[in-house]
From Swiss-Prot:
Lineage of source species: Bacteria, Bacillati, Bacillota, Bacilli, Bacillales
Manner of cofactor binding, per the entry note: Binds 2 nickel ions per subunit.
Xref: PROSITE patterns: UREASE_1 (PS01120), UREASE_2 (PS00145), UREASE_3 (PS51368)
Record-given protein name: Urease subunit alpha
Pathway(s) this gene product operates in, as recorded in its UniProt entry: Nitrogen metabolism; urea degradation; CO(2) and NH(3) from urea (urease route): step 1/1
Source species of the chain: Staphylococcus carnosus (strain TM300)
Pfam assignment, any one: Urease_alpha
Coiled coil: none
Post-translational modification remark: Carboxylation allows a single lysine to coordinate two nickel ions.
Chain's gene name: ureC
Length: 571
């Protein structure tokens, strides 16, 4: 016996279906469902009088040993990823993504590929959005509280360096030498996120670099505050090629040892992660931005310049002075800071992100920007660029899927690929760690509802513990059981170099977290950056600092008002 209902009735019960559009927060972006795995009338839903009951959508016979039986199912969720906007059930088993598809009881339902049994828990995803956990690849490990702030924004992986509130850590993403690297690997045992640490990349003696890779560093950071000379950079890249790790570069702002072209000659055709490629965060003044046109450069932005607003320029001078230990009474220090802040290149940066020329977004946590705003600022840029540049090719009214896929890739899959961890995290694909973020669409990009780490609920919005219901105010982010006991170490990964992994760094340091090697880095090119692989010719006028793409001037107007901003932070 069939039953008919209106589209609005269906959506209120089971969430949007194919062809429906969802507004993301208070932005001007709309995600349209491309595919729905549901069989209408056979949706799995939990609750009183709902279908997930014994003998109905829950199979009464299967045990957990059946490989199709999930530990957890997120029902009827909208999955937004770099390659899809799907409506599906999402199965999790042993902490990994088992499958997205149709969940239920195959004895009485068609097309079931995720079985709900007595060992299965349910998270209701009706009307919710699920994304992969974000990855921030420019983290100064200055303060361990950064991990919790990042988690509450939807970021589940941190890559960078530092040792606490030292001057070196405040200025450079470096954990220098085996002793510091080992201590940070041990400290990570108490953090609720995935981590990987970068060592110091300045040494003409290869042995001084190699020992850091053996100690567990997943790459090296070459930073101008330690000396970003072409020679130091070339030596670091030699070691990276031998050990399949990444080099992250904060280039030479003062052009002391050479210009942008000299740096590129030292790099040759070797892959490199170019930090804050616009240049306000540091790097060859005024034309570091040109490096984004090279096929071996994987360019990222840090978020202080994203998006370009009426306040951006004024904010930057003090940030540069404090972060890089400069003295306001020394004219040369003031000149150094001023040389990095150019409204013309900052205005071009948003456009280059929108064109897919810049591939990633990161934070530069406490060292020129905010660890909890990577995701928010990414979507603010997407909103501003739609306002100023219109639809991307293939998009149309109530369907911004191409732009959405481009921007979500910037803080999920592309950082994972760049640092050799995409086998484990970075997207919603079978076999990857179930690091998942669940959003109410009205709060998308700014305040997630729940964060899962390796399939365990790690952080969630929840009410007063003495309340009669879980929504008793005050509603706020609270640690869940994924952060307690053995789950703290059992649900997060510490990434290390392959040589450290092969030498059993886990046993050497008595680490209890999952330890996994980075891999597949040195053969990368910009073509591997999902939805963000453009390499047009870039030029910068040395007098006006205007930026040209294939000979055409690009710029944007500073925003006076943004979405995902004050209306979400009244309390």
């Amino acid at each position: 016996m069939s039953f008919k209902m209106t589209q609005s009735q269906y959506t209120s019960l089971y969430g949007p279906t194919i062809g429906d559009a969802i507004r993301l927060g208070d932005t001007n972006l709309f995600a349209t469902i491309e595919k729905d795995f549901a069989n209408y009338g056979d949706e799995a839903t939990f609750g009183g009088g709902k279908s997930v009951r014994d003998g109905m959508a829950q199979n009464p016979n299967v045990t957990r040993d059946d490989r199709y039986v999930a530990d957890t199912v997120i029902t009827n969720a909208v999955i937004i990823d770099y390659d899809k906007v799907y409506k599906a059930d999402l199965g999790i088993k042993n902490g990994y993504i088992m499958k997205y598809g149709k969940a239920g009881n195959p004895d009485i339902m068609d097309d079931v590929d995720i079985i709900i049994g007595a060992s299965t828990d349910i998270i209701s995803g009706e009307g919710k959005i699920v994304t992969a956990g974000g990855i921030d690849t420019h983290v100064h490990f200055i303060n361990p509280e950064q991990a919790y702030v990042a988690l509450e924004s939807g970021v589940t992986t941190h890559i960078g360096g530092g040792t606490g509130a030292s001057e070196g850590a405040k200025a450079t993403t470096v954990a220098p030498g085996p002793w510091h690297i080992h201590r940070m690997l041990e400290a990570a045992e108490g953090l609720p996120i995935n981590v990987g640490f970068t060592g110091k990349g300045q040494a003409h003696n290869h042995t001084a670099l190699i020992e850091q890779i053996h100690a567990g560093a997943i790459g090296l950071k070459v930073h101008e505050d330690w000396g970003a000379t072409p020679s130091a950079l070339s030596h670091a890249l030699d070691v990276a090629d031998d050990y399949d790790v990444q080099i992250a570069l904060h280039a030479d702002t003062l052009n002391e040892a050479g210009f942008m072209e000299d740096t590129m000659k030292a790099i040759k055709d070797r892959v490199i992660h170019m930090y804050h490629t616009e240049g306000a965060g540091g790097g060859h003044a005024p034309d570091l931005i040109k490096s984004a046109s090279y096929p071996n450069v994987l360019p990222s932005s840090t978020n202080p310049t994203l998006p370009y607003t009426v306040n951006t320029i004024d904010e930057h001078l003090d940030m540069v002075m404090i972060t890089h230990h400069l003295n306001a009474s020394i004219p040369e220090d003031i000149a150094f800071a001023d040389s990095r802040i150019r409204k013309e290149t900052i205005a071009a940066e948003d456009v280059l992100q929108d064109m897919g020329v810049f591939s990633m977004v990161s934070s530069d946590s406490q060292a020129m920007d905010r660890v909890g705003e990577v995701i928010t600022r990414t979507w603010q840029v997407a909103h501003r660029m739609k306002e100023q540049r219109g639809y991307l090719d293939g998009d149309k009214e109530y369907n911004d899927n191409n732009r959405i896929k481009r921007y979500i890739a910037k803080y999920t899959i592309n950082p994972a690929i760049t640092h050799g961890i995409s086998e484990y995290v970075g997207s919603i694909e079978e076999g990857k760690l179930a690091d998942l973020v669940i959003w109410d669409p009205a709060f998308f990009g700014v305040k997630p509802e729940m964060i899962l780490k390796a399939g365990m609920i790690n952080t969630a919005v929840n009410g007063d513990a003495n309340g009669s219901i879980p929504t008793s105010e005050p509603l706020k982010y609270r640690k869940m059981y994924g952060q307690y006991g053995g789950n703290l170490t059992g649900t997060s990964i510490t990434f290390v170099s392959n040589i450290a992994y092969m030498n059993d760094i886990e046993r050497q340091l008595s680490l209890h977290r999952m330890v996994r090697p980075v891999k597949g880095i040195r053969q990368l090119t910009k073509k591997d950056m999902k939805n963000n692989s453009e390499t047009p010719k870039l030029d910068v006028d040395p007098q006006t600092y205007e930026v040209f793409v294939d000979g055409k001037l690009i710029t944007s107007e500073p925003a006076k008002e943004l979405p995902l901003a004050q209306r979400y932070f009244l309390f």
